[in-house]
């Protein structure tokens, strides 16, 4: 998790849930994620399984098992390609951004869709929802 449980369940605009089933592993957190969605948070589920939270998800990306890295690279490719990045944050607080940018340049949504066996447009929409949210934990 990238934030406190409270931040995720009470302060989020979008939640990116990757390979996790909080309703079974942490039922209270799972219930709070569902409540966050009911309050208006967007939910993106990235999981090959049809977990219960998929019913409330705005997007469910059913990745082929073992393709999480390609998915992450594809998300980064879209963030960069569509200029959905915080340039000042990158300049002030990151290192080797250009190397990462070079690494993900070939991970187009179409290539990632083929690798992960998902829809390229849904991947784009997931990236846009996540990148445009003010508060978006993973």
Spans of features found by a protein language model:
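Cofactor-pocket helix-loop regions in the catalytic cores of large enzyme subunits
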Residues: 1-138
């Amino acid at each position: 998790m990238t934030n406190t449980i409270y931040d995720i369940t009470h302060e989020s605009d979008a939640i990116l849930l990757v390979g996790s089933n909080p309703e079974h592993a942490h039922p209270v957190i799972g219930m709070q994620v569902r409540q966050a969605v009911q309050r208006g948070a967007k939910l993106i589920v990235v999981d090959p399984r049809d977990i219960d939270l998929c019913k409330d998800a705005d997007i469910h990306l059913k990745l082929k098992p073992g393709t999480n890295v390609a998915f992450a690279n594809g998300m980064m490719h879209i963030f960069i390609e569509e200029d959905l990045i915080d340039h000042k944050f990158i300049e002030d607080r990151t290192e080797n951004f250009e190397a990462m940018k070079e690494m993900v340049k070939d991970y187009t949504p179409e290539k990632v869709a083929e690798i992960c066996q998902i829809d390229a447009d849904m991947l784009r929409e997931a990236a846009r929802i996540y990148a445009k949210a003010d508060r978006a934990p993973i």
